[in-house]
A protein has these predicted regions:
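Signal peptide processing junction and immediate N-terminal pro/mature segment
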Residues: 20-22
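Hydrophobic helical h-region of N-terminal Sec-dependent signal peptides
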Residues: 10-12
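Bacterial N-terminal signal peptides that target proteins for export
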Residues: 1-8
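Short N-proximal segments of mature Sec-exported proteins
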Residues: 24-76, 90, 95
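A charged, solvent-exposed segment within the mature domains of Sec-exported extracytoplasmic proteins
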Residues: 30, 108-109
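N-terminal signal peptide c-region/cleavage motif recognized by signal peptidases
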Residues: 16-18
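Short, compact, well-ordered microdomains
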Residues: 82-108
């Protein structure tokens, strides 16, 4: 009896897990959806942070908060619905690169 109750509890808990807890490659549409949900905001923060942390070309200045980074990405997704079918990481990087462009290197002599 105890085993069947535990199994039923496990099955129910798996069904009620938020969908943003799943590991998957997401599109801009899905990330935009998460941007709109208050309870998914921590996911957005983590996602955007991972984009910045894994990019060799991110030029985010010191002092910029994770909230600011998430706002930039979420605003970009809101303003560009025609691009939201692309993968979210590429869109997030593009949004951050547009808002925080890297300084231009001097021309080689």
């Amino acid at each position: 009896m105890l085993r069947s109750t535990a199994m039923a509890g496990l099955a129910v808990s798996m069904l009620i897990q938020p969908d943003y807890a799943l590991a998957e490659i997401i599109t801009g549409n899905k990330l935009h959806e998460y941007c709109q949900k208050y309870d998914a905001r921590q996911f957005v923060y983590g996602y955007v942070t991972s984009v910045v942390d894994t990019s060799k070309f991110a030029c985010v200045p010191p002092g910029v908060s994770v909230g600011q980074l998430a706002d930039v990405v979420c605003r970009y997704l809101s303003n560009h619905p025609e691009k939201r079918h692309y993968d979210a990481a590429s869109l997030a990087f593009g949004a951050l690169n547009a808002s925080f462009p890297c300084p231009k290197l001097p021309a080689a002599k």
